[in-house]
Amino acid sequence: MEGDDLFDEFGNLIGVDPFDSDEEESVLDEQEQYQTNTFEGSGNNNEIESRQLTSLGSKKELGISLEHPYGKEVEVLMETKNTQSPQTPLVEPVTERTKLQEHTIFTQLKKNIPKTRYNRDYMLSMANIPERIINVGVIGPLHSGKTSLMDLLVIDSHKRIPDMSKNVELGWKPLRYLDNLKQEIDRGLSIKLNGSTLLCTDLESKSRMINFLDAPGHVNFMDETAVALAASDLVLIVIDVVEGVTFVVEQLIKQSIKNNVAMCFVINKLDRLILDLKLPPMDAYLKLNHIIANINSFTKGNVFSPIDNNIIFASTKLGFTFTIKEFVSYYYAHSIPSSKIDDFTTRLWGSVYYHKGNFRTKPFENVEKYPTFVEFILIPLYKIFSYALSMEKDKLKNLLRSNFRVNLSQEALQYDPQPFLKHVLQLIFRQQTGLVDAITRCYQPFELFDNKTAHLSIPGKSTPEGTLWAHVLKTVDYGGAEWSLVRIYSGLLKRGDTVRILDTSQSESRQKRQLHDISKTETSNEDEDEDDETPSCEVEEIGLLGGRYVYPVHEAHKGQIVLIKGISSAYIKSATLYSVKSKEDMKQLKFFKPLDYITEAVFKIVLQPLLPRELPKLLDALNKISKYYPGVIIKVEESGEHVILGNGELYMDCLLYDLRASYAKIEIKISDPLTVFSESCSNESFASIPVSNSISRLGEENLPGLSISVAAEPMDSKMIQDLSRNTLGKGQNCLDIDGIMDNPRKLSKILRTEYGWDSLASRNVWSFYNGNVLINDTLPDEISPELLSKYKEQIIQGFYWAVKEGPLAEEPIYGVQYKLLSISVPSDVNIDVMKSQIIPLMKKACYVGLLTAIPILLEPIYEVDITVHAPLLPIVEELMKKRRGSRIYKTIKVAGTPLLEVRGQVPVIESAGFETDLRLSTNGLGMCQLYFWHKIWRKVPGDVLDKDAFIPKLKPAPINSLSRDFVMKTRRRKGISTGGFMSNDGPTLEKYISAELYAQLRENGLVP
């Protein structure tokens, strides 16, 4: 074409630089200026000249010139040196956390808090009456419906929920209002403890202020459940009706009894009996009866029955709960005289039959009759399900109108079957008044209060009435802000008050010092000094739990569970909050013990930042993680590595997500999953070897000095099992491990009768610590008891040091019985100087005792609970065989279902990926949970002291070399062995005794 010569091969105009945009703009500006001057005439030039003159005049007025370009009022300084430190940033970073909307769904502003159907001021006025306050924990296995149960209560209490969509209203999607973390919503399970304070009404229209705490159901988060148990007066244990009483439910019942907490049971998911299992009414009754019988087999004499109003039936998916008492009041109250309602209610459970106005405990002859529960409750319920799902609306209308006095709207008749069924059931059962009524009947405020405080606090004192005394349970990240969850046991707490905070890790030592029999003057001075050392904090804010909001209040009363801001920096895990008016009150104050988190953290990872310069961010984030996850343990090894100990894979996965995405916001390198080990022995010490602090290794004579001799032997397995449960003995002879040394006579009797100890050893027990025991086996002829008592505290402290970190790999010692055989103390040495030397020498003597008793390495064993369809059992067995040391010890058929409950054991170090393998192999039809409740430890195969054990490179170690392999790898990771990757400088007795003595032992064949 003719115009092709004007453009090059790339479409650019020839002769013009395509990148010279300035030239193009200048050409356009000149053209526009020319056109403007041409068409507007010369008048425009006069305007420009006048503007220029005006601007020059204004500059002169302001004093702007070449000498003063910014005016005479502006001083220009020329600096040649830095006035700011190079370490000071030009822009200060934000030190406070932002609201972190990206990881939480939360209502921040008070004006946006959803309104309730009741008057909140009336609820707050009820806080002045402790008897009208109930603290309820909602606990149960995974996916049993705890959070959905809380949704029903939240919906009943609020006028409008901000996050409630149409699908949620119709029942297609769960609300899960108490899951306010996006991680919880994405994973589909609760991770953190949450709660809500509500005003609830029972069947008698009496109102109560109830603080509900919703605990996670996954066993990895059992530490959160432990916090809920510590805070609650009563627990609702929610059970999936299909799975029944699993091993998790058994453990929750035992923990509730141990914590002196009253119990109610919610048998949830009744819809699954009808729609999933398709059981006929009689079979459904037998299934429910079987579950309740299993519950009563674990409750130690406390009888639970639907007619006692402590068993609630529910289907949280369909939005209803009911008790037998409530069902009768809705369905039969209009046809039965009020005087006979209670009598009729008591006959609606068990082997009771009805025919023509008569009740019998045996079936009627020649009459096909069902038990009363089936006839009067299940059959009407089945009819409602049948009519609603089959859309037989005329029959359903008649049934509802004649029996429940309920009318259906035209809009409801247009619903799909499932939303329609939910709507009908909610019309019948209305609000959750039956559930609230059961809670109020089970709650016994005065009996429970004393038992609970006695269990949670250190024995020996009684806090004065009226003194502010509260239990700080944990630190929570609530809506991006840091709050403390606190239960108040006595006194009044107001915003702006100054309070004292004592960490529970210091409670025992503090209380012991106050109980010492010393003079009044010394006691008052000591108490005053100690009180000055206790951190004091100002209460900045007080709030009530709301699920996805915090409702601010000005004060909190006895019995309440509240959130407090401003005190979290004064403690780590939990604490005692108090404020005393006098020194006498201070002497009587009780302190709370550290919480028992049920399980022990044995799942281990090592991590470090990807970029070393980001280490401060990691350290700050780890401090937050340590506070927000109650059961986590964070340590720093000598090698500089940061170690995190948690409860399992899911626990670690959630923790690391928070660490990366919410708190540190950096990239992190982590190790493969590891575990902790324990050190023990398998035999008695072969010799009594004294350990001295004045050993000569150069041939000169030994100087007289301090020497200690300790022997070790394995503890009885029965005693180890009892100590793992923090008790000794059984029944009335049972002693709690925390106060075990306070009653030496009873302890001696238990050791003789229950464990077969001789009288001398049982009377001379000095200490129990971390599953180990120290016994004084010295002879009065060799050392006087008076002299020994002077150094008893230091000897026990040295024993504590030894069992915390053993000689093999600095892992805790477990299951060892130490005996103090002899101690030699020079008479011409100052006592205070001698005390400082006894502690490390006693630690060394315990190491020698262990190394002379055939030391072994113990590994933790997970118990695994698998729910799987029966035909898939061979797959489970095959998966267990592939894991070293795994075994199945029990298989239980779940009654009325095609499911099996498989119980087994698998070593923690072999458990990584087991759940994933199970889910993939069974196509999602198998579910497992791994836990370390019973604290089972098993010997690792091999000899830890065998230097010649074969350990190949880049290959799994042989079974007989595992013990040595684990010890050496642990020592290298901790920096104990510094000889490189293939170093073999393992534990040895030679390190702790003289070279001459070691050579003699070697000649006699006592050491390798």
UniProtKB/Swiss-Prot annotation:
Gene3D superfamilies: 3.30.230.10, 3.30.70.240, Elongation Factor G (Translational Gtpase), domain 3, P-loop containing nucleotide triphosphate hydrolases, Translation factors, Yeast translation eEF2 (G' domain). Coiled coil: none annotated. GO terms for molecular function: GTP binding; GTPase activity; U5 snRNA binding. Residues 131-338 form the tr-type G domain. Its main location: nucleus. The modification Phosphothreonine is found at T88. Keywords: GTP-binding, mRNA processing, mRNA splicing, Nucleotide-binding, Nucleus, Phosphoprotein. The keyword Repressor does not apply. Residues 315-317 are annotated as: G5. Residues 504-536 are annotated as: Disordered. The keyword Nuclease does not apply. Residues 214-217 are annotated as: G3. Residues 268-271 are annotated as: G4. GO terms for biological process: generation of catalytic spliceosome for first transesterification step; mRNA splicing, via spliceosome; spliceosomal snRNP assembly; spliceosomal tri-snRNP complex assembly; spliceosome conformational change to release U4 (or U4atac) and U1 (or U11). Residues 509-520 have a biased composition (Basic and acidic residues). Residues 524-536 have a biased composition (Acidic residues). The modification Phosphoserine is found at S85. Residues 188-192 are annotated as: G2. It is found in: Nucleus. It comes from the Eukaryota. It holds the Pfam family EFG_C. Residues 140-147 are annotated as: G1. InterPro entries: EFG_III/V, EFG_V-like, EFTUD2_N, P-loop_NTPase, Ribosomal_Su5_D2-typ_SF, Ribsml_uS5_D2-typ_fold_subgr, Snu114_GTP-bd, T_Tr_GTP-bd_dom. Belongs to the CWC complex (or CEF1-associated complex), a spliceosome sub-complex reminiscent of a late-stage spliceosome composed of the U2, U5 and U6 snRNAs and at least BUD13, BUD31, BRR2, CDC40, CEF1, CLF1, CUS1, CWC2, CWC15, CWC21, CWC22, CWC23, CWC24, CWC25, CWC27, ECM2, HSH155, IST3, ISY1, LEA1, MSL1, NTC20, PRP8, PRP9, PRP11, PRP19, PRP21, PRP22, PRP45, PRP46, SLU7, SMB1, SMD1, SMD2, SMD3, SMX2, SMX3, SNT309, SNU114, SPP2, SYF1, SYF2, RSE1 and YJU2. Component of the U5 snRNP complex required for pre-mRNA splicing. Binds GTP. This is Pre-mRNA-splicing factor SNU114. The lineage of its organism: Eukaryota, Fungi, Dikarya, Ascomycota, Saccharomycotina. The gene is SNU114.
